[in-house]
Amino acid sequence: MTNKISSSDNLSNAVSATDDNASRTPNLTRRALVGGGVGLAAAGALASGLQAATLPAGASQVPTTPAGRPMPYAIRPMPEDRRFGYAIVGLGKYALNQILPGFAGCQHSRIEALVSGNAEKAKIVAAEYGVDPRKIYDYSNFDKIAKDPKIDAVYIILPNSLHAEFAIRAFKAGKHVMCEKPMATSVADCQRMIDAAKAANKKLMIGYRCHYDPMNRAAVKLIRENQLGKLGMVTTDNSDVMDQNDPAQQWRLRRELAGGGSLMDIGIYGLNGTRYLLGEEPIEVRAYTYSDPNDERFVEVEDRIIWQMRFRSGALSHGASSYSTTTTSRFSVQGDKAVLLMDPATGYYQNLISVQTPGHANQSMMPQFIMPANNQFSAQLDHLAEAVINNKPVRSPGEEGMQDVRLIQAIYEAARTGRPVNTDWGYVRQGGY
């Protein structure tokens, strides 16, 4: 491949996708956000993990082509005409290096179309993945997907504030929707998305990849089997140093695009993880936040935030996220019989869990042996396909995404006021774990 894409292509004009380049200008109109193209910034290494975990074939740590990490060979492909067709909306680093390669392990799904504000980039990606160039759309002609019966669903991988608009447009086009987390930047937008899905009689699934990760599911199974005993405490920590010089990260520092800082981006893993590990909803939250007033990265969004949640069972949780401390992804669940440790807890491929009992630690880690069928991205993509084919509910529906956004807003309120906030809203989880 000799084609090259500059990382500065039309940088000042638009935001093209999640983990892609963000506008350097204050002009944040919808046209500025979605109308222009952006370049391919060099992707960073995958989330760090222990050597006990093995990556799938072809999962190089650093992308080696302009279209991101190469897609590994699909060892058990189904006939293409029997697969569920996705249109990928947004071609940022996450789409290029995780989602698109993830289709190699899918048994029921295929890449049918691409949607991007950068035509040159889209053509390169389409060529590498065998997508018909006539199936390349941009943000202005996105609604034409309604005329393509081979597109069954769209996967929205755009900045948070654009999720609602493109989800609603997709439903109006008669397509199912998978949307990246957080679901939206407001509870009102979440409700609009849910209402649009119901009106179109289509499925809405939020891309909570850890719900489909073998290690996270194994952790839930251990807890549900009472291996830890009565649960008392959950602690989560998700942190990463925000590089404001990385064009792919700049939109995350703009409140109008991101809706918030580290909590909306990475803290949500701990928030959602606490809920699915405990299997219940918090009834009260408290929170504290801090951003260095001299750090220009955090003029609009928070850097560090910690929150505590109280549950009806008596369990308590402590969550933390940060944009200025070294990368961590760590969960701990304490019961009266044992402690479950997850470190890394929310990595892409190398999550590990262990159980420690009183008097000694059981250090026999349970590594995630990755096969394409167990890849969390492949499993997530196929889950929506199977739910549609079999007319079953999805594991991570829109209501689940809205609950997290509502809790995030409550956490921000608690941090702002310095008072506890009641969250006993009577929410009942749908879809199960």
Curated annotation (Swiss-Prot):
Gene Ontology terms for molecular function: glucose-fructose oxidoreductase activity; nucleotide binding
PTM remark: Predicted to be exported by the Tat system. The position of the signal peptide cleavage has been experimentally proven.
SUPFAM superfamilies per the UniProt record, alphabetical: Glyceraldehyde-3-phosphate dehydrogenase-like, C-terminal domain (SSF55347), NAD(P)-binding Rossmann-fold domains (SSF51735)
EC number: 1.1.99.28
Subcellular location field: Periplasm
Protein keywords: NADP, Oxidoreductase, Periplasm, Signal
Pathway listed: Carbohydrate metabolism; D-sorbitol biosynthesis; D-sorbitol from D-fructose and D-glucose: step 1/1
Cofactor note as given: Binds 1 NADP(+) per subunit. The NADP(+) cannot dissociate.
Transmembrane annotation, as ranges: none
InterPro entries xref list: Gfo/Idh/MocA-like_OxRdtase_C, Gfo/Idh/MocA-like_OxRdtase_N, Gfo/Idh/MocA_Oxidoreductase, Glc-Fru_OxRdtase_bac, NAD(P)-bd_dom_sf, TAT_signal
GO-annotated cellular components: periplasmic space
Signal peptide (from-to): 1-52
Chief location category: periplasm
Catalyses which reaction(s): D-fructose + D-glucose = D-glucono-1,5-lactone + D-sorbitol
Superkingdom classification of source: Bacteria
Spans annotated as Disordered: 1-24
Names of required cofactors: NADP(+)
Gene Ontology BP terms: sorbitol biosynthetic process
Family as reported in the entry's similarity comment: Belongs to the Gfo/Idh/MocA family.
Subunit architecture: Homotetramer.
Protein name, UniProt field: Glucose--fructose oxidoreductase
Organism: Zymomonas mobilis subsp. mobilis (strain ATCC 31821 / ZM4 / CP4)
Encoding gene (name): gfo
